[in-house]
């Protein structure tokens, strides 16, 4: 699965997004 980092450095995984 692809992993991206949002502007806060939180890992965004395919099918499960994590935010603070």
UniProtKB/Swiss-Prot annotation:
Keywords: Disulfide bond, Protease inhibitor, Serine protease inhibitor. GO terms for molecular function: serine-type endopeptidase inhibitor activity. Retains over 90% of its activity after incubation at between 25 and 55 degrees Celsius for 1 hour. Activity unaffected from pH 1-10. Loses 34% of its activity after 2 hours at pH >12 and 65% of its activity after 4 hours at pH >12. It comes from the Eukaryota. Heterodimer of an alpha and a beta chain linked by a disulfide bond. Belongs to the protease inhibitor I3 (leguminous Kunitz-type inhibitor) family. Competitively inhibits trypsin stoichiometrically at the molar ratio of 1:1. Also inhibits chymotrypsin. This is Trypsin inhibitor AeTI.
């Amino acid at each position: 699965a692809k992993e991206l980092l949002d502007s806060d450095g939180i890992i965004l995984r395919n099918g499960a997004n994590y935010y603070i």
